[in-house]
Amino acid sequence: MAPNLRKSHPLLKMVNDSLIDLPTPSNISTWWNFGSLLGLCLMTQILTGLLLAMHYTADTTLAFSSVAHTCRNVQYGWLIRNLHANGASFFFICIYLHIGRGFYYGSYLYKETWNTGVILLLTLMATAFVGYVLPWGQMSFWGATVITNLFSAIPYIGQTLVEWAWGGFSVDNPTLTRFFALHFLLPFMIAGLTLIHLTFLHETGSNNPLGVSSNCDKIPFHPYFSTKDLLGFLLMIAPLLTLAMFSPNLLGDPENFTPANPLVTPPHIKPEWYFLFAYAILRSIPNKLGGVLALAASVLILFLAPFLHKSKQRTMTFRPLSQLLFWILVANLLILTWVGSQPVEHPFIIIGQIASLTYFTILLILFPLTSALENKMLNY
């Protein structure tokens, strides 16, 4: 009998072991679709980004015009740009849902997989930030100025660090050039990290909604989950195309239709919607260094998830109190997102401060306490 090429060829063997003959728990739900959706997002973003880079000029005098030229004169340039801009939003929707799933079902107990995932999130955030600066509109320029300026809060080396990042004494041509270089490079770094993420995942196999070992009931990834993923792809591509074609500027800021002007500050400087929760936490502390530390902590706190797990059960499936707390946390994040988009005035200031405090309290104090209480209740 001839050898099966899929199982013997050095390259195809790797593909086979991770996409075809991969033993998968039979009971994983649609919440497990987001990993492959993130892969699809990454491929879409790299493809559209590459096509956009072919028509982009990384120069302060030409960047804004080159983007306008792409939209007006390049075949389907408007569509490529709209897919790329809104694709970023879908990327973040998917990654936030993916993290939420991991948090709910205790997937963070696969420490290496979880930690590489958090590093992936940080890299994605950096990529989105530098990418937002490239069209060189008002919000691009002022967003870059405000966020890079945060590094000056670092004692002793802060100011030097900021000027080194800027390549001068303000956000200018060198900044734009290096941001373009970084925006081109980072997605490939994300692709590399994704392979590491998957390597660690395939060491242990997937978690499942029950949080118990599924070794006794595994099914091949193909055709079962390849088909299920394909449905997921369709369900994500449909709204993405709808948004890109019918309402491409819905999630953008109108300020970015004005070319960057260092002499005019926009009335409300705010990032894209997917950074608003962190921006609200940053603003809720009336001290520069304190705000920066809280901003960093709001994302880096994910690294602590495995250490804050005190429950005897892995998932929240059979833990009603933790479930309640989880959904309060989700609501709290939505409130933070909303507050981040509002001006800095009463009552938004106090709402933001309460929501920020609640965010850290739930994660650091209430989750471990609730888990301990649930453990106690199991003994009765």
Curated annotation (Swiss-Prot):
Cofactor dependency: heme b
Annotated positions binding heme b b566: 98, 197
Topology of the protein relative to the lipid bilayer: Multi-pass membrane protein
MF terms (GO), sorted A to Z: metal ion binding; ubiquinol-cytochrome-c reductase activity
Residues annotated as transmembrane: 34-54, 78-99, 114-134, 179-199, 227-247, 289-309, 321-341, 348-368
Entry binding sites for a ubiquinone: 202
Superkingdom as given in the UniProt entry: Eukaryota
GO annotations of cellular component type: mitochondrial inner membrane; respiratory chain complex III
Cofactor, free-text remark: Binds 2 heme b groups non-covalently.
Alphabetical UniProt keywords: Electron transport, Heme, Iron, Membrane, Metal-binding, Mitochondrion, Mitochondrion inner membrane, Respiratory chain, Transmembrane, Transmembrane helix, Transport, Ubiquinone
Family (UniProt): Belongs to the cytochrome b family.
Protein name: Cytochrome b
Species of provenance: Amazilia tzacatl (Rufous-tailed hummingbird)
Lineage of the organism: Eukaryota, Metazoa, Chordata, Craniata, Vertebrata
This protein's encoding gene: MT-CYB
